């Protein structure tokens, strides 16, 4: 009998603590969620060449990067580049740079 009374008391206590308060305390928790538009305004996407636009000196782009990617896509050129270097492997497969 005591166990049933304790169980009933625990259920009532849990119910009273879980109910939302009528004094508007949920207004604080509603501020935690923002709309998609507000979120998009708050978080700006970083530009691709941000360092060049802001005046901060960054590393200049490598002019051979496109050729390096072409050589990496060819398994034979990529293997040869591991052995003798990228520029020489590219020259042997695709002609002078």
Curated annotation (Swiss-Prot):
Positions of modified residues (4-carboxyglutamate): 65, 69, 72
Protein's UniProt name: Osteocalcin
InterPro entries for the chain: GLA-like_dom_SF, GLA_domain, Osteocalcin, Osteocalcin/MGP
SMART domains tied to this protein: GLA
Origin: domain of life: Eukaryota
Job of this protein: The carboxylated form is one of the main organic components of the bone matrix, which constitutes 1-2% of the total bone protein. The carboxylated form binds strongly to apatite and calcium.
PROSITE patterns: GLA_1, GLA_2
Similarity-based family: Belongs to the osteocalcin/matrix Gla protein family.
Organism (species): Gallus gallus (Chicken)
A GO MF label: calcium ion binding
Maturation propeptide residues: 21-48
High-level lineage: Eukaryota, Metazoa, Chordata, Craniata, Vertebrata
SS bond list: 71-77
């Amino acid at each position: 009998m005591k166990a049933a009374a304790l169980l009933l008391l625990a259920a009532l206590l849990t119910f009273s603590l879980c109910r939302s308060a009528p004094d508007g305390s949920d207004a604080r928790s509603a501020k935690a969620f923002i709309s998609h538009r507000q979120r998009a305004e708050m978080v700006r996407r970083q530009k691709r060449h941000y360092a060049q636009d802001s005046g901060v000196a960054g590393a200049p782009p490598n002019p051979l990067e496109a050729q390096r990617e072409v050589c990496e896509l060819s398994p034979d050129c990529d293997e040869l580049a591991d052995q003798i270097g990228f520029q020489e492997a590219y020259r042997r497969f695709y002609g002078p740079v």
